[in-house]
Amino acid sequence: MGHIVQGSDEETYFFTQEKLEQRNIPMFYYNEENIKEGYEVILGNAFDDTHIECRRAKELGLKIYTYAQFLGKLLEETPSIAVTGAHGKTTTTTMTSNIFKHNRVTSYLIGDGTGHGEKNSDFMIAEACEYYRHFLAYHPDYAIVTNIDFDHPDYFNDEYDMFDAFQSFVNQVKNTVVICGDDRLASKLKPAHAKTITYGFNDGNDYQIKNVQTSTEYSKFDIYKNNTLLGTFTMAIFGLHDISNATSAIALADINGISVEKIQESLDLYRPAERRFSEYKFGSNVVVDDYAHHPSEIKATIDSARRKYAGKQIVAIFQPHTYTRTAKFLNEFAESLLTADKVFLCPIFASVREKEKIVGIEDLQKVTPGSEIIHGEEDFDKLNFENTVFLFMGAGNINKLCHKFFEKNTSN
């Protein structure tokens, strides 16, 4: 889009910085000297205006945006699509961007750190996060809502508070909202101005999924538009939740005049987002790195593994993310994890915002019969299985443990 970009972060490595390194975007450690005259400053969601670089920007009289404010500004500059939902945002944004970028001039920004900018885009596609109601900074032309499921208990009071946030968001959409009609709460949304299109497996949806077939390589499914076959689609995805997510992207592409043939060509080129069922194999085993950090996401990830690798043992290695979420969903986490054949738990990865340890991993172990605790690579001997899918799940830094486990088993 023509802007010169640099950024600052703490010294700890995180997987999203890899995309920045590939584009030669300068990254610095926090220092007020990083901020110069003439800069525009975007403040990440984890920080406030007391941050050392933000204070320097204010001293210089620079324009300071929150991430949501700046993204909202970008979405106003071109026809825009915002993808939101409690679960599946990143995957669905990736799917939608994949279709549109092969058929229209498209800019996009995805939660796994992936993005692309064009000066004169036909569309700007962005992942829209509900946390702290950040997405209320956006007034997109189109939106996808994958689901509404209570999360972020450190901010939202309950599912009704969360529903209210989503209702406020869809009220700001200008043209069309594509909503999962199967979802208990999302299906109740009533946009104030935009048209509503529904999708899902159930009868009555505008775009209905039927005749799902799954192999170890792909899933094949039909989509009916208003009870008439739109097309048969094939994709390298495996869970029913991902087929549902794909259907929302297909519906939005169809609404915008992209042909079924062009949609399928784009789906053939689809690759999963970072840390969304990322697979590595050794011997008879499969290692999966996945961002699942909510009970619903864990259950869906285990379901995907069973569908793709029927006959293999499923071992879940889970690192809870934040004390508040772990405490709120303690029993729900246990219930979802126990759909695996064996469960291992890692110490909780706390948020920088959390000041008090209100729950420990031992509390989750108590309600998860048969589970064991893994503290680090010194406990890898506990994972001595064959013909197994190892699911490393969590939103913290469990991906590092996952990669160390894979390296240990492939270094000889």
What are these regions (language model features)?
Residues 212-230:
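Acidic-glycine-rich active-site phosphate/pyrophosphate-binding loop
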Residues 10, 69, 86, 111, ...:
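Cofactor-binding loop segments of dinucleotide-utilizing enzymes, especially the Rossmann-like FAD-
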Residues 12-17, 35-37, 48-50, 116-117, ...:
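Short, charged/polar "capping" segments at the starts of alpha-helices
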Residues 36, 45-195, 247, 254, ...:
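Phosphate-binding loop of NTP-binding sites
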Residues 1-66, 70, 210-211, 230:
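N-terminal leader/targeting and accessory segments in enzymes
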Residues 6-11, 28-30, 65-69, 109-110, ...:
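Beta-strand->loop->alpha-helix junctions that form or flank phosphate-binding loops
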